[in-house]
């Protein structure tokens, strides 16, 4: 499948610092955040004009699920648009607090762990064909996902009883199973719950929940692009070396703690391989595969960055990727800070900086400041991101959903939508079922809109 439907779901961490004596719980802060949403959507679970879903998830975490995208840059742009949507809610909620005499600054973090050790996720969705064995896909994909922190981890300072240590991944310490149908209780690497949001006879949705939330656009593109390409190669019958892991959960933690990528992890049958060995195999197959694949500039950019990052890990010289890979950008920032102020990695100010890197408020968040200074690469523009806040992807089913929502809101009509249904809540209860996520034009939807 060379054209694939993809999406990213991001849960955001919430906290608030108060200026006066009045305090609010995280639940109350989250309700302030969503008050504007509830006022027009009559719910804290809504679909937006850009085709995305916005809702309040378990544990007071706002969650933004991008609309269906069919290109990498489109997906990165819509992922960033989610940050802008949440930032707008943040600014509105702070104003509401001020109007009610509760002075406070609300912080939304696009990260995966809080100070209490709780974890929240960034889930990737990939449409795959129903034909073929799902177990083959998961068997080949699992070693790739366990070791890809080397190329797309967000980085984290982990405080241990002995000392502070810099890790590749925020999420690695919180994953407890390889493949499972649960998402919250056991936190697997691949979630097998079969909800395709499409024609179930043709498709299923691969739900990857092991990834870190990335601030860097190029890291997001590498994370999603490399996984999509590995899936495409599996579907095309490309043969990979068998890197079945003896214990994926132990391996994911070991990989996260080794910035050199050279520490051996145990494979099934007593063999060993390093994260670098495993990633090199997938990368080498990708380079070969591209030679016969239909040209695609975005995929070629992904494979180029993938190779440069593996070279950087191998040589431990990160100069050629230090504006493109989250954990590398973050580690360089910490090292400069430590050198300038003569402090240890365990210093609370470093942990504060770690958190501030993920603050989505422009002008305050550290990543935003790095980006403005040219210390973090761009692959999209502010104008494209702003457009994606209100405009759905024009090449997928999201266009139909977005146009229906816009028309219904402008006509003052009551409606219900989900990923596959568009429904007018009138006497006739007219509903259109959109089972093909690749389809952006549908006469039935046009007629439904025209009838408003």
Curated annotation (Swiss-Prot):
Catalysed reactions listed for this entry: ATP + [prokaryotic ubiquitin-like protein]-L-glutamate + [protein]-L-lysine = ADP + phosphate + N(6)-([prokaryotic ubiquitin-like protein]-gamma-L-glutamyl)-[protein]-L-lysine
Enzyme class: ligase
InterPro entries recorded: Pup_ligase, Pup_ligase/deamidase
Keywords: ATP-binding, Ligase, Magnesium, Metal-binding, Nucleotide-binding, Ubl conjugation pathway
Pathway where it operates: Protein degradation; proteasomal Pup-dependent pathway; Protein modification; protein pupylation
Binding site residues for ATP: 53, 66, 419
Residues annotated for Mg(2+) binding in this entry: 9, 55, 63
Short name of any one Pfam family annotated for the protein: Pup_ligase
A GO molecular-function descriptor: ligase activity, forming carbon-nitrogen bonds
Keyword presence, S-adenosyl-L-methionine: no
GO biological processes: modification-dependent protein catabolic process; proteasomal protein catabolic process; protein pupylation
Catalytic residue positions: 57 (proton acceptor)
The protein's Enzyme Commission number: 6.3.1.19
NCBIfam families: pupylate_PafA
Family (UniProt): Belongs to the Pup ligase/Pup deamidase family. Pup-conjugating enzyme subfamily.
Additional remarks: The reaction mechanism probably proceeds via the activation of Pup by phosphorylation of its C-terminal glutamate, which is then subject to nucleophilic attack by the substrate lysine, resulting in an isopeptide bond and the release of phosphate as a good leaving group.
Function: Catalyzes the covalent attachment of the prokaryotic ubiquitin-like protein modifier Pup to the proteasomal substrate proteins, thereby targeting them for proteasomal degradation. This tagging system is termed pupylation. The ligation reaction involves the side-chain carboxylate of the C-terminal glutamate of Pup and the side-chain amino group of a substrate lysine.
Annotated HAMAP family: Pup_ligase
Name under which the protein is recorded: Pup--protein ligase
